[in-house]
Swiss-Prot record:
Homodimer. Interacts directly with flagellin (hag), forms a 3-way complex of Hag, FliS and FliW in which Flis and FliW do not directly interact. It is found in: Cytoplasm, Cytosol. PANTHER family: FLAGELLAR SECRETION CHAPERONE FLIS. Pfam families: FliS (PF02561). Transmembrane segments: none annotated. Belongs to the FliS family. The gene is fliS. Gene3D superfamilies: Flagellar protein FliS. The lineage of its organism: Bacteria, Bacillati, Bacillota, Bacilli, Bacillales. It comes from Bacillus subtilis (strain 168). This is Flagellar secretion chaperone FliS. GO terms for cellular component: cytosol. Keywords: Bacterial flagellum biogenesis, Chaperone, Cytoplasm. Disulfide bonds: none annotated.
């Protein structure tokens, strides 16, 4: 029987025990990680690594878009923004454009920060203290 890497086991446990809000936060953080890795790959002229990381970021943006609750009015605006970010990531991949990546990184950071604040507010309301997400 193979021994599992403790870090991998910890990550898996974090995903398995996370709330839906925490999972969304993990997706935003993962997207930011892959965008940054893709930008580094462009700077290092590593097109294979750039492509791999941008595809991962694109997949995360698609997942975030697919999981929107379409019964909420704000979802239409968020969906349009996710579509725009996805298209910009595709264009950045084709054109090797770090400026486009920086643009999308800014949007994802804004979404992530707002989401993190919402999680903290919800925890504070529920538990009477502001836990860190």
């Amino acid at each position: 029987m193979a021994i599992q890497n403790p870090y991998t086991a910890y990550q898996q446990n974090s995903v398995n025990t996370a709330t839906p809000g925490e999972l969304t936060l993990m997706l935003y953080n993962g997207c930011l990680k892959f965008i940054r890795l893709a930008a580094q790959a462009i700077e290092n002229d590593d097109m294979e690594r750039k492509n791999e990381n941008l595809i991962k970021a694109q997949n995360i943006i698609q997942e975030l878009n697919f999981t929107l609750n379409r019964n909420i009015e704000l979802s239409a605006s968020m969906g349009a923004m996710y579509d725009y970010m996805y298209r910009r990531l595709v264009q950045a991949n084709i054109k090797n454009d770090t400026g486009m990546l920086a643009e999308v990184e800014g949007y994802v950071t804004d979404f992530r920060d707002a989401w993190k604040q919402a999680i903290q507010s919800e925890r504070k309301d529920r538990h009477g203290s502001g836990g860190i997400a």
